[in-house]
């Protein structure tokens, strides 16, 4: 008789994913409101272009500290409780930001707001790994991020129209902040945490206490994550992910470089979001197919190809003046599609090379720390260098050259990814065997 359970399907996983996606959508909408309306905020509060870099960098840097804290708190108390507080009720700070009278006040409130929202990505992504098994994670992640981008893209032009309303950016912050509080209450009422390892074939049919036996998060375990070769390569790649700059400076780029108004430039957010949505769906589907057909190299090949594709499209879409917002919208859609492939690939890769109880910590390191550092450096650099050299030159080096380097770095995954996946599977097999014999083992990941 086999000791391995069939692939698990957690009951109610898609409705739960929808609820978590709603929370991430509102968080992202409020976080992007300042960047998309920065031209009018700049006029309202008398700021320079570099102020956008400072605001974005501060919001990312604070997440370096609070993201891991929220993951620890979720392990110490409850993932649901942390999400209710940090991604829901925390919206009151967005309301406060809407009352800012100068740059300093906006910086303080916006940074506090970001400190709470840093909980969303690592904890929610960890939960996805517990809701879906490896054969469906790509589609789940792709659908989640894609839908968020699609709805966000529809809201993008609407947010842009707030620039035509007196103090429209303030009304935007107030409205989204209030809605975020309501989403927090919805999570409190309807969300059901599946528990650690609920979708792993080796652990799904074990009782909760047995699955949670390894859930304690320690510094030793967290530090051991960076010794996983594939994870270390992904961290370096995240620091080279120049495409992150598009979401922050895309509208400002079109305003400053090609002379469009804020309202007109904001139109590209719709095709960008649609492209990102389709890229997520295609990326998630390709990821699951690649995982089945080539478990050793499939995901890596798709991820690498997405980086090269983005660099080519970014060069064509940012370095030439087409004089028509529709043409720029087309290229932004293609950039969104190439960028959208990433979540449905890199998140499942991280899940595959880390045991269930450490995925939250892994995503805190990957997203809250390394992605935040990269985003902060890009935003600060683009803000200050944009004032000196112009955003067109900055976009060439960050969106094109750096992304080509990123794709080359990912080639290193071909040597170690399969080995790291096998290591995790052997550990889970050992845990199941020990559980069936009434024992608990913790062989670790190093």
Residue ranges and their predicted role:
Residues 109-148:
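Cytoplasmic helix-loop-helix junction between adjacent transmembrane helices
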Residues 171-189, 393-412:
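Symmetry-related core transmembrane helices of the 12-TM Major Facilitator Superfamily/SLC fold
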């Amino acid at each position: 008789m086999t000791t391995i359970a069939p692939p698990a399907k957690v009951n109610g996983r898609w409705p739960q994913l929808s609820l978590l996606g709603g929370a991430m959508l509102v968080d992202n909408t409020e976080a992007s409101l300042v960047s998309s309306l920065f031209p009018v905020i700049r006029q309202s509060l008398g700021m320079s272009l570099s102020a956008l870099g400072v605001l974005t960098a501060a919001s990312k840097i604070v997440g370096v500290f609070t993201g891991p804290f929220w993951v620890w708190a979720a392990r110490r108390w409850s993932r649901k409780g942390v999400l209710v507080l940090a991604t829901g009720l925390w919206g009151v700070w967005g309301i406060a930001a809407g009352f800012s009278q100068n740059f300093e006040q906006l910086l303080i409130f916006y940074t506090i707001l970001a400190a709470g929202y840093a909980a969303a990505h690592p904890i929610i992504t960890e939960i996805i790994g517990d809701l879906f098994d490896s054969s469906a994670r790509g589609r789940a992640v792709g659908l989640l991020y894609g839908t968020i981008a699609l709805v966000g893209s529809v809201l993008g032009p609407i947010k842009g129209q707030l620039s035509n309303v007196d103090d429209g950016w303030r009304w935007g912050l107030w409205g989204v902040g209030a809605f975020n509080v309501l989403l927090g209450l919805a999570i409190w009422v309807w969300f059901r945490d599946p528990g650690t390892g609920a979708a792993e074939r080796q652990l799904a049919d074990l009782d909760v206490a047995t699955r949670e036996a390894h859930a304690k998060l320690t510094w030793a375990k967290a530090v051991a994550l960076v010794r996983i070769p594939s994870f270390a390569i992904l961290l370096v790649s995240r620091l080279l992910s120049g495409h992150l700059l598009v979401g922050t400076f895309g509208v400002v780029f079109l305003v400053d470089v090609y002379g469009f108004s804020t309202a007109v430039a904001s139109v590209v957010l719709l095709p960008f979001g649609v492209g990102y949505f389709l890229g997520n769906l295609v990326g998630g589907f390709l990821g699951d197919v690649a995982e089945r057909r080539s478990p050793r190299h499939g995901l890596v090949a798709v991820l690498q190809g997405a980086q090269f594709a983005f660099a080519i499209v970014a060069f064509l879409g940012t370095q030439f003046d087409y004089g028509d917002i529709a043409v720029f919208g087309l290229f932004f859609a293609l950039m969104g599609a190439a960028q959208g492939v990433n979540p449905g690939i890199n998140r499942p890769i991280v899940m595959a090379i880390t045991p269930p109880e450490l995925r939250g910590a892994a995503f805190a390191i990957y997203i809250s720390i390394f992605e935040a550092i990269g985003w902060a450096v890009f935003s600060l650099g683009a803000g200050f260098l944009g004032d000196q050299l112009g955003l067109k030159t900055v976009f060439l080096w960050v969106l094109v050259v750096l992304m080509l380097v990123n794709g080359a770095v990912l080639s290193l995954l071909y040597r170690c990814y399969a080995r790291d996946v096998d290591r995790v599977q052997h550990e889970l097999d050992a845990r199941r065997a020990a559980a069936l014999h009434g024992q608990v083992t913790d062989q670790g990941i190093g």
